[in-house]
Amino acid sequence: MLRQFLFSTASRRLVRPMIAPHRSASSSLDKTEFTTPSQIVDYDDPPHLPVPEYPLRPDEPLETRKQRLLYQSRKRGMLENDLLLSTFVAKHLRDFSAAQTAQYDELINGVSNDWDIFYWATETKPTPPQYDTEIMRMLKQHVKNEERVQRIRQPDL
C-alpha cells in the first residue's frame, strides 16, 4: 500500500513543492535557476550552552602531540575541514617547532566551532586576533592552493 502511494500522482503533488528549485521571474519557464544565499547564516551560541574547556597537556612529548594533532586534523566531523587540515598537516606538521605545534593545537582545539576555522581559513570572515598567528597565515596560504593541487581525498598515513 505504501508503494502504491509513493508512486501515485497524489504523493507527487505533495512532495513536488518541497523539492522544486527556485525559479526566477526573469528566467523562461523551461530554464531552472538554482541560487545560493548571498550571506552566511551564522548565529551566536546561546549563553546557556556551556562550552567545555579543552584540557591543556603541558607535559605531552612533542612527537606524541604531533601524532594526536595528525589524528585530530583528519577527524574533524566536517569534510571541508578534514580535507583542508589533513592536507595542511601532511605538508607542514613534521617541520613545526614546539611553539608552532602549540599554536596549531590551540587553533584546532581552542575554537568551539569548526565552521569558524573554515571561514577564517577561506577568509570569508576576519580572523580574531588571538588566532591570527603564523600558523593561521600558513593555513590561509595553503587554502589558496596556488599550486592547484587536487584535494579530493585525505593524504595517506
From Swiss-Prot:
It is found in: Mitochondrion matrix. GO terms for cellular component: mitochondrial matrix; mitochondrion. Residues 1-24 form a transit peptide. Signal peptide: none annotated. GO terms for biological process: mitochondrial electron transport, succinate to ubiquinone; mitochondrial respiratory chain complex II assembly; protein-FAD linkage; tricarboxylic acid cycle. Pfam families: Sdh5. Transmembrane segments: none annotated. Interacts with the flavoprotein subunit within the SDH catalytic dimer. Plays an essential role in the assembly of succinate dehydrogenase (SDH), an enzyme complex (also referred to as respiratory complex II) that is a component of both the tricarboxylic acid (TCA) cycle and the mitochondrial electron transport chain, and which couples the oxidation of succinate to fumarate with the reduction of ubiquinone (coenzyme Q) to ubiquinol. Required for flavinylation (covalent attachment of FAD) of the flavoprotein subunit of the SDH catalytic dimer. Belongs to the SDHAF2 family. This is Succinate dehydrogenase assembly factor 2-A, mitochondrial. It comes from Drosophila pseudoobscura pseudoobscura.
